[in-house]
A protein has these predicted regions:
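Cofactor-pocket helix-loop regions in the catalytic cores of large enzyme subunits
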Residues: 542
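Glycine/threonine-rich ATP-lid/beta-loop region of ATP-binding domains
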Residues: 547-550, 554
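Hydrophobic alpha/beta core scaffold segments
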Residues: 562-566
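N-terminal localization/anchoring segments of enzymes in phospholipid and broader phosphate metabolism
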Residues: 1-537, 555, 559, 571-712
């Protein structure tokens, strides 16, 4: 029986993951502008972590919730450890920015003016003119005194606080004022180019808050500015819904979204050299504790680096953009339904294009033989071709049912808008099941054919989002297997009504019996090992923190099952611990694409079973969400999926190995052939498309041009 010391705290494991992302920003072999991108990602990750996870723990402390977590820690103990670890993380973020990235940018023709005092005379004149023309009319200076309450400060906004003293009054008391840095004006302001010490042309940028701070005096004309400092607060953005009581779920979520801007302040970021009196005022008025204050040496909110990554003219300092390749099975003149009837089709994004998924829905919308389209949507893009196709299908008189998950965190507003639009177009829109998030990725197309009705299904590990499909690694299958079609119909009947099938053919659905299915397959390997037979599990996912699953894996390890896990993010399991998990290895791959697919392999006494799905090994996925696990049965496709797992297990460039003490270390690649799995998948996708093209047209053998994605 595993003890509490045999598990890692979920939040601390997440912080370890953010350190792995930060290591990409610190790695000098990573292209310079990619390093900016990775540092920006660590900052946005930390923001969300505070708004959701830290906020939730604070709610537990307020509610005197005493239950301990998987690692035996109370909410208060977790908060203390989180504060210590995140302060260390932030210090490392800024030493990376100040000591490594800023000097490297200067060497490569981009100077960042760190403080407005460093502006040259000409730059200062340009900045002042820019302020008066573009910024000053937008600003709203706010004072705070007995007649004016402390200003309401929105979540995540950047502000400048100031201490003022009335001019020509020696005994005047210090007064507090502030101004919000407007988000409607670009934060990165480009100044006129200059020549560096070698006579090379150099671009120069400064941040908007520095220009405002330089011109604070013009906002408070009758005052002297005693001190001014940028600051930023993070608020509790975690909301809970009483879905049983909510008459209109859509309306209730809209109400809660408004509250999110004004939740309890849970984190304050401010300059490290802040005036003590000014900090005291902020601390008191925001009711924030010392451990939640981050004094920072550098610009607040490093997410601006993503905008800097997007600056024109620096493509030579970025990883070359990869164009997703066409899928060989679809590189012909047949329509998508004819191609699916030839056999199941595996899709591997972003190495292969997401276009076939869009085309599947679009073709169904326009095909006169299609009777119905049913789809679940969790996160979609801002200008979604999938949504457009569903609306077109309804307009063409087809039965269109769409489950839009309104509770997809931070996409609630987006999804509400899409739900309203689809309803107007004539689609049946379902808002999900009470108490459950629908996280499964499934599309069902019902088509009338010569031999009767045929069902076509797309199942995937990732969202129906054509934008993130270029950045996230995911897998999907297009099939017309009658048993999967029957199960797909049952899934949608369960979502739209109250019916639950007596039995499932091939799909495993959470929260009904997916947990049981996983445990059964893990325990089957344990039994094989105990009987002296070869036993092997390979599994890839985003996170693992389910105690029952981890306990079953520990038992399997002790029985001699070889267990190889690829876990990008949170891992509450301890690997390589003698007598507990010596047969378990865990690796995390952090590369140019976000690893997002969920793939599961069980050796099963030399009759291997391979599955893919939408669920991680977490309680929320197995117990509180609608998730789907689907089998890969075609032997050719099974080999391809096993190849994905094996290549990632060979990665020695972007892989980090979990150590028995809970830390992660990069793979030792000395004397080894370098294997970067993401780069290799790109090369393989290009080769497969090229080979397919050549087999059709030998004239293209000399030069192959990757086919551009229509989503670009």
């Amino acid at each position: 029986m595993a003890e509490k010391n045999d598990y890692v705290n979920r939040e601390l494991s997440w912080i370890e993951f953010n350190y792995r992302v930060l290591s990409e920003a610190r790695d000098k072999s990573t292209p310079l502008f990619d390093r900016l991108k990775f540092l920006s990602i660590t900052a946005s990750n930390l923001d969300e972590f505070y708004m959701v996870r830290v906020a939730s723990l604070k709610d537990m402390v307020h509610a005197k919730y005493a239950k301990k977590d998987i690692a035996g820690l109370t909410a208060k103990e977790q908060l203390d450890k989180i504060s210590e670890k995140t302060h260390q993380l932030v210090d490392l973020q800024y030493s990376t920015y100040n000591r490594s990235l800023v000097p490297a940018l200067k060497q490569n023709g981009l100077r960042i003016v760190m403080e407005h005092e460093d502006l040259t005379e000409d730059e200062a004149a340009f900045a002042d003119e820019y302020f008066h023309k573009n910024v000053y009319p937008v600003l709203t200076p706010m004072a705070f005194d007995s007649s004016r309450p402390f200003p309401l400060i929105r979540n995540k906004t950047l502000n400048i606080a100031a201490l003022l003293k009335k001019k020509n009054e020696k005994e005047a008391e210090l007064e507090f004022a502030m101004v919000q840095v407007p988000s409607v004006i670009p934060r990165i302001v480009e100044l006129p180019e200059e020549k560096d010490e070698n006579g090379e042309t150099q671009r120069v940028v400064i941040l908007l808050e520095e220009i405002i701070e330089r011109n604070m005096q013009s906002l408070f004309l009758n005052y002297d500015i005693v001190a001014s400092h940028p600051f930023r607060i993070m608020r509790n953005a975690d909301f809970s819904l009483d879905e049983e009581e909510a008459v209109d779920l859509l309306e209730e979520i809209q109400k809660q979204l408004k509250k999110r801007q004004w939740g309890e302040a849970i984190r304050l970021e401010i300059e490290s050299n802040v005036d003590k009196q000014l900090l005291k005022i902020l601390k008191k008025e925001l009711s924030i504790s010392s451990e939640d204050i981050f004094q920072i040496s550098g610009p607040l909110d490093l997410t601006f680096l993503m905008k800097m990554y997007g600056l024109d003219g620096f493509d030579h300092l970025k990883t070359p953009k990869y164009t997703p390749q066409p899928v060989p099975e679809l590189m012909n003149e047949d329509n998508i339904f004819t191609n699916i009837r030839k056999g199941d089709i595996l899709l591997h994004h972003p190495y292969q294009s997401f276009d076939p998924v869009v085309n599947f829905v679009r073709s169904a919308a326009r095909d006169p033989e299609v009777l119905a389209i049913k789809q679940t949507l969790y996160r979609v893009s801002g200008n979604s071709p999938i949504i457009a196709a569903l609306a077109e299908a309804a307009d063409n008189g087809k039965q269109v049912s769409v489950l839009v998950e309104l509770k997809a965190r931070f996409d609630e507003e987006n999804n509400i808008n899409w739900a309203k639009m689809l309803e107007k177009a004539g689609c049946h829109v379902i808002y999900g099941l009470v108490g459950l998030k629908t996280h499964s990725k499934i599309t069902l197309v019902v088509r009338m054919e010569e031999d009767g009705i045929r069902r076509y299904v797309h199942l995937g590990t990732g969202n129906y989002n054509d934008s993130t499909a270029k950045l996230y690694t995911d897998c999907g299958i297009l099939t017309c297997d009658p048993q999967i079609g029957e199960d797909a119909t049952a899934v949608f009947n369960m979502l739209s009504g109250y019916s639950e099938p007596r039995a499932w053919n091939k799909l495993s659905v959470a929260p009904l019996w997916l947990r049981h299915r996983f445990l059964r397959m893990i325990n089957r390997e344990t039994e094989h090992a105990r009987a002296g037979r070869e036993a092997h599990i390979m599994a890839k996912m985003n996170s693992i923190c389910d105690k029952e699953i981890i306990s079953a894996l520990y038992d399997a390890s002790c029985a001699g099952v070889k267990i190889e896990l690829i876990v990008r993010g949170i891992c509450c399991l301890k690997a390589g611990v003698p007598g507990l998990s010596e047969n378990i290895s865990v690796r995390s791959i952090v590369g140019n694409f976000l690893e997002h697919s969920r793939i599961f392999y069980f050796f099963n006494d030399a009759s291997p079973e391979v599955y893919m799905g939408s669920a991680d090994w977490m309680p929320r996925n197995l117990d509180r969400r609608v998730e789907i696990l689907f089998p890969v049965e075609d032997e050719n496709l099974k080999e391809k999926v096993i190849h994905i797992l094996k290549l990632e297990l060979e990665d020695n460039v972007k892989a980090h190995l979990l150590q028995p003490d809970g830390s992660y270390e990069k793979v030792d690649k000395r004397g080894k052939v370098l294997v970067n799995s993401q780069d290799q998948f790109c090369e393989e996708a290009i080769e497969m498309a090229k080979a397919c093209q050549e087999s059709k047209d030998p004239a293209v053998t000399r030069i192959f041009q990757p086919i551009e994605s229509s989503n670009e």
